[in-house]
Every structure is written in structure tokens, then in C-alpha cells.
């Protein structure tokens, strides 16, 4: 995509299946369409705001990818008027996320106060750590495997009543009631291809599943991207114009910005 953007001219409109970091460098004939996780992060921020939340805590893995997605969420959340009370990163290679969670909930501060009191009073105290009570929701970035570890640990550390909102990365793409039982109540956004059983693409999904069942889940989101790309390509000249507006696709409700990047509005579900 970067190479296409650097060309002085394109002979015909081109729909590239990815985004570049500097869309202003692209020519007027280059359109960019990808499954950008940043779009999902902004979607989470908008959803939380519509729910009436104003105070967020962020729990994300240690990675460059996570930093980019978190930045997109943070920018959107602050623009809406929200506050970020705490942000912690966890090691995705570990199973015990207690240190990150206790810091997120200020339980480490509660323990520190207890230690100081014991030192000052010189005697043992009965003590039950108290988490902070001002968090409206937690923005969680995690894979299904990580979320299945983190959600029970949040409950263990007395945060079972705090809503958790996440991106599509928390969902494997297929219902697994047994393995996902600990995720009950967790909200996430994802594409209609996986959530809407009444879409006009359902016959295509059924055909792909019947033909290649092993790949129908693993590559489901890429299949949806290909279908939407095929369907909107004839209308590239109209994309973003007042006559076209948006397109209700299998990857989401599609709109084009001034830099000719296609953005998605997703659907919501919960475990």
C-alpha cells in the first residue's frame, strides 16, 4: 500500500486491502480498506460513552500493537469528554496477571496502607483490601485465551461488578459456551459476518463453511473483508460522497473519510 501511495498517478481507482500510517500521502485514486483494530478501539470508546460511563481503566498487553490500539481508544475517549483513571499493561506470556490487576484497582495501595499501619501500631491487624470504587468500566485488550485468564482474576480481586468492554480480538469467532463460561457479561464489538445471522451474506458464509469448514472460523474475518471489497469496488468513485453515504457490509457499516480510508462501525454482543 505504501508503494501505491508513493506513485505519482494511478490509471484507475484502486482499493488496497490495508491502511498506511500517513493517508494524506495517498493520491485521489487510492482507497484503503482494512480491518484496523484502531477502528474497534474507537468503537469501544463511543459505546462506553453512550452507556453513560465517564471514568475508564485500561488493561492491555505489553506490545507495540497494543500501544497503537490504546492510543486510538484514548484519543477518542478524551475527545468525548471521558477520563482515564488508571492504565496497566500485563505480560501476555504469563498466566498470573495479579500484579497488573491489583495496580489497576489500587489494591496495591490498599495493601501499602495496611503495612504502614502495622508498622506504626506495632501489632497485627485484621485487614481486607479494598479496591477503588470510582471505575465505570475497564477497557480490556486480550485474545480469547488471555481473557479467559484475566476475567476470573478480575472477579477474584473484587471487580466482578465492573463492566468490561473489549474489541473483537477477545472473541474466537465461534460460540464455545464451556470455554467462555468465565467471560459471562463481557461486552465486545465485532463484524456482522460473525454476529448477524440474517445478513445478505449468510448464504456465502454457509457455502464457505460447507466447502472449507476448518478454515471458516480461522479466516472468517478475512473472508468478510474480501466479500465487502468485491462489493464496494464498483462504487469507489462514489464512496464518501453524499450520494453514497455508507454501505452496510459484512465487516460493518462502512464509511470513507477525507483521506479515502474506509472505516467500520461494528455490532455489539456479550458472552
Predicted regions, residues:
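Sec/Tat-exported extracytoplasmic proteins
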Residues: 48-52, 60, 73-81, 105-108, ...
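Solvent-exposed loop/turn segments at secondary-structure junctions
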Residues: 1, 19-24, 62-67, 90-95, ...
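Segments of small-molecule ligand-sensing domains
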Residues: 203-271
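Extracellular/periplasmic periplasmic-binding protein-like sensory domains
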Residues: 27-30, 100-118, 133-135, 151-227
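Stable alpha-helical elements in mature extracytoplasmic
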Residues: 3-4, 40-44, 65, 69-76, ...
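Periplasmic-binding protein-like
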Residues: 1, 14-17, 55-61, 110-144, ...
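Extracytoplasmic ligand/sensor domains, especially the bilobed periplasmic-binding protein
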Residues: 1-89
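Short hydrophobic alpha-helices and adjacent helix-cap/hinge residues
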Residues: 16-21, 99-103, 229
Amino acid at each position: 500500500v505504501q508503494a501505491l501511495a508513493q506513485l505519482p498517478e494511478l490509471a484507475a481507482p484502486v482499493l488496497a486491502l490495508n491502511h498506511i500510517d500517513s493517508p494524506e500521502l495517498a493520491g485521489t485514486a487510492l482507497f484503503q480498506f482494512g480491518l484496523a483494530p484502531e477502528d474497534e478501539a474507537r468503537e469501544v470508546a463511543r459505546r462506553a460513552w453512550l452507556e453513560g460511563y465517564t471514568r475508564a481503566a485500561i488493561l492491555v498487553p505489553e506490545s507495540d500493537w497494543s500501544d497503537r490500539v490504546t492510543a486510538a481508544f484514548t484519543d477518542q475517549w478524551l475527545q468525548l469528554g471521558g477520563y482515564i483513571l488508571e492504565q496497566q499493561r500485563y505480560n501476555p506470556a504469563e498466566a498470573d496477571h495479579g500484579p497488573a490487576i491489583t495496580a489497576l484497582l489500587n489494591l496495591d495501595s490498599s495493601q501499602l496502607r495496611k503495612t504502614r499501619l502495622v508498622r506504626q501500631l506495632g501489632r497485627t491487624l485484621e485487614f481486607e483490601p479494598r479496591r477503588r470504587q470510582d471505575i465505570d468500566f475497564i477497557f480490556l485488550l486480550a485474545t480469547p485465551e488471555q481473557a479467559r485468564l484475566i476475567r476470573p482474576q478480575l472477579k477474584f480481586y473484587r471487580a466482578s461488578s465492573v463492566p468490561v468492554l473489549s474489541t473483537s480480538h477477545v472473541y474466537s469467532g465461534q460460540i464455545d459456551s464451556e470455554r467462555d463460561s468465565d467471560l459471562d457479561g463481557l461486552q465486545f464489538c465485532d463484524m456482522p459476518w460473525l454476529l448477524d445471522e440474517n445478513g445478505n451474506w449468510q448464504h456465502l458464509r454457509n457455502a464457505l463453511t460447507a466447502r472449507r469448514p476448518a478454515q471458516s472460523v480461522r479466516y472468517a474475518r478475512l473472508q468478510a473483508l474480501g466479500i465487502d471489497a468485491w462489493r464496494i469496488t464498483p462504487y469507489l468513485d462514489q464512496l464518501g460522497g453524499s450520494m453514497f453515504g455508507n454501505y452496510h457490509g459484512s465487516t460493518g457499516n462502512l464509511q470513507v473519510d477525507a483521506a479515502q480510508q474506509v472505516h467500520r462501525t461494528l455490532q455489539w454482543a456479550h458472552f
